[in-house]
């Protein structure tokens, strides 16, 4: 009888133990209270991640004396009736079927009254903490102050809780715009709202934030690497600095994870609290922020501080600290030998065997540490950046661009280079472009083109490299640039949808391909010519397929409206869509292409009239469609039907704001005449100036 095939050795044994432990975790009920991470023993360390000799990593000691007690206080559980009520309230807020803002405000007040005395229970509840986040995001400053006051005295435990920490985050973000407001008198609110007997808190929001700092004081070193508290600490630091807190932005130093946006979509833009712009702060906040930043790192020596750069939880907090130190307190703070940036990088020259050069080289290829290096490069003083670029990055920028992780550091570097250094970097990266395109690493060429346009660097060598990397046939070239698949048969398309229906990797590659093509169109000369010639070579069916593609259609829109688009190209290209306008206008993506045809034919009025007549023939069909009605409105088709003369004036771009007396845009011959007249006027003045 054949024996079962089994793996032998220490790694197989460790793998079986891990699988058993994983099954046990899946079967056990999840503890609702946040637990402190236990330090991994030597037996539990993954053999693939063993700490080799000389590695720039030192594990943090979890059993620190300054850490808070490990037992989490229990605030109680909601009974079944309370859970049912809050679940229904959550559904009502999700549906957002309120007639007006006043009705929604009354409903939120009723939920707050029901939650009175149970706020901590709701915040720590797995099923109801999301409701608390929604309530906070929809609350006014009076309600936020009251809830903030209920949390005071418990923040040390709440920020470490798996669910309550999110509520603290949302509370800090929404309370930030009110830190400079004065405390309203309690009598005034009692007069306004007779039904509400709850007393107003005596503390202002600024004073409440200071209370939070007092509660957390002495535990900063531990909270720095606490898996739940670290997120809240980052938000708190940015609020104290008055910096924008925008979790949805990819460039935000606080957005290191995917965050659900739990706010309710409203039609009134005034109801949304602005958190994406700098906020005014009290004077006391700045001194408090300096003290917090000093206390956070004072207990760590330089070795541990550098090890924090590769810590998955501590690294984002360190990013915020470095960002605030360099941008908020001025780059002159980098000269202080006790500053964070100086403790990480003690020297300016980055010599071969210096501590700073060794530290930076260790971060270049680290998936976690490279994010800190991006923040440092973006914010560091110019003198320090020049030394870093000259001694660490310049000679190896081509090989760094090939790497998946170090490539992002290269992007931040390109953004800071001057014209001469950018020219040299372009020459080093250009030979790597075929390999980057083959592996779909398209961000580096895209950013390189953008920076060359900003600095005025010649892009002809980039155009040659891109042309050599793609097919010589212009039709095939566009398919390669945009990652367009050949048209499959019906059976093949059904099988492909079943197999790769949600392939996010392919969608991301198509997005970056489209962005690269759009960037190429902004560059005058050969770079944009590669895309323009490929678009003109496409058949009508192929253009329709591209126009209906949500990602690729952006390239057509860009080609029709960008400044490098010539009148000759638009005259040839726009006529390719005649006869298919209604089909495109009824498509979600194609309708945007039809909208782009309006500005593209501003100097081609005869083509625009032909297109308008085609749309008019299918008026009923367009009016029955949501996107069709948008196209009808954007093309001013009602004006075309009733007042054809006014429509023609609008089609030519004549501004008729001043009582119908508009100014016609100057044609090419008018511009040439004006230029010749100005030159003649200068020549006539020249002899007079010489005599004087």
Swiss-Prot record:
Family per similarity comment: Belongs to the NOP9 family.
Q: What does this protein do?
A: RNA-binding nucleolar protein required for pre-rRNA processing. Involved in production of 18S rRNA and assembly of small ribosomal subunit.
Alphabetically, which GO biological process terms does the record hold? endonucleolytic cleavage in 5'-ETS of tricistronic rRNA transcript (SSU-rRNA, 5.8S rRNA, LSU-rRNA); endonucleolytic cleavage in ITS1 to separate SSU-rRNA from 5.8S rRNA and LSU-rRNA from tricistronic rRNA transcript (SSU-rRNA, 5.8S rRNA, LSU-rRNA); endonucleolytic cleavage to generate mature 5'-end of SSU-rRNA from (SSU-rRNA, 5.8S rRNA, LSU-rRNA); ribosomal small subunit export from nucleus
Ranges for the region named Disordered are 1-69, 181-201, 485-508
**Disulphides:** none
Pumilio repeat intervals: 114-149, 355-390, 391-431, 534-574, 576-613
Which keywords are on file for this protein? Nucleus, Repeat, Ribosome biogenesis, rRNA processing
SMART domains to which the protein is assigned, alphabetical: Pumilio
- One Gene Ontology cellular component: nucleolus
Annotated compartments: Nucleus, Nucleolus
Gene Ontology molecular functions: RNA binding
- What is the name attached to this protein's record? Nucleolar protein 9
- Where does the source fall among the domains of life? Eukaryota
- Is Cell membrane found in the keyword set? no
Which residue intervals are annotated with compositional bias (Basic and acidic residues) in the record? 11-27
Compositionally biased spans, kind Basic residues = 1-10
